[in-house]
Amino acid sequence: ATKMPVALMDILASHQIRSAALSGLYAREKGRSGWFAEVSLELSGISALANQATNYLMNENIPKRQGSLHPNIAPYGEQLHLDGGSIVLAVGSDSQFAALCKILGSEELETDERFFDNQSRVKNRSILIRELQNSAKSHSRDSLLNSFHSKGVPAGAIKDLKEVFASGSPGAKAVIQEEIEGSNRIVRKPITTAYSVTVFGNNTV
């Protein structure tokens, strides 16, 4: 069995109940009565299945273990392992695939009948990633990622937490000093407001 490294269902459920509470408060402000809201961990997880749930409900397709791979799009979720780290691809259209091939100097893949359209790429994705990896092996992670971004090829660097929270990174900006003790660092919510949220003890006389 495989377990998520964080309590994902709890986090999803907390977002669902927050939305329900805010909707109730808004309804009350508009003159309607509030409501009782109930959220379960299981239903929160089911509601987050997105395209996997749709694949089953439309075609009774039960997904197999496939890691980060997208079941209906390729190369989407495939990883390129390079000097300096790895990149995960999220190529969702033929034009993006063409740009990817051009950057890697492998334009012949674009016209290869095995990869001619998305359906073909999904069918032959194990062959495709071997071809892409072979074409990319002479590149470094950061230089290739810069090329992808400049040409509109969706991709991202795979980072460990040391790199996530490195100085100057978006992750570093998400870290705040806990105001109560002043010594603990925590990750703030990814929302910026025009005022500071009141913390415990702010109004203690």
Question: Which residues make up each language-model segment?
Answer:
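Acyl-CoA thioester-binding alpha/beta core of soluble enzymes
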Residues: 47-205
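Active-site-adjacent "lid/gating" segments in soluble enzymes
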Residues: 1-86
